Amino acid sequence: MFETNYWPFPDQAPNPFNAQVEQLSATENVYIFLTTLFGILQLVYVIFKLLCTMFPALHWSPIWRGLENFWLFLSLASLAIAYWWLPSMTFTGYWALTIIATILGLIMLIMMSVKFVSFVKLFYRTGSFAIAIRGPIVLVALDVTIKLHCTPFAILVKEVGNIFYLSEYCNKPLTAAQVAALRICVGGQWFAYTRSTTTSAAKVAAANSTAKYHLFVLQGVAEYTQLSSVKFE
């Protein structure tokens, strides 16, 4: 007799969904777990950002910033490890990757929307397009400047410093050399940005606190890498 592709007794046919799960290898299970973990961590990261937008005081908290960086590192690490298993994926793995990529795309849209709303608020408050667009650029430039002039170990020191930063350091006045060091890092734009975009004493204090926080990080990096371009008293 010829073999047929249909099952003669439907009630005895194997469940295709159960069969698919049973055929997954340990590698695929790890991959799906890691990609799912990445999606969950990214969702939590977006919640962090939204909370910082609604409650600006959280953005200036070094402990909060340290947790934010740690969460982002953990999510990216899970994705990197997942891609290490990419060559051994089957159709199920690609299906999971498609779902995670869709979630990530939605997250990016949410993040872009939050950034756009912040930009519009800053533009409305200052009335200057140049100031509104310069704010995020200055913050990114400061972080990139640190990373470009430091070793991987110094970058680790910077991230650890985000968590173990002493809040009372913000109450100390900046010296002339420290101000000069900050101007070197951001091309002299940092203090112009803080003066132009703050309208109250509380916001001025928060901006100065952030400047000193970045200075604290730079001091810690300089101690470990002997940066020649940054001099402190």
From Swiss-Prot:
InterPro entries: M_Torovirus (IPR024251)
Subunit structure: Interacts with many viral proteins in infected cells. Interacts with envelope E protein in the budding compartment of the host cell, which is located between endoplasmic reticulum and the Golgi complex. Forms a complex with HE and S proteins. Interacts with nucleocapsid N protein. This interaction probably participates in the viral mRNA packaging into the virus.
Virion surface-side positions: 1-31, 91-93
A GO CC term assigned to this protein in UniProt: virion membrane
Name of the protein described by the UniProt record: Membrane protein
Compartment(s): Virion membrane; Host Golgi apparatus membrane
Membrane topology classification: Multi-pass membrane protein
Keyword set, alphabetical order: Host Golgi apparatus, Host membrane, Membrane, Transmembrane, Transmembrane helix, Viral envelope protein, Viral matrix protein, Virion
Intravirion side: 53-69, 115-233
Main location: virion
Annotated TM spans: 32-52, 70-90, 94-114
Coiled-coil annotated spans: none
Family affiliation: Belongs to the torovirinae M protein family.
Signal sequence interval, chain numbering: none
Pfam families noted in UniProt: DUF2632
GO-annotated molecular function: structural constituent of virion
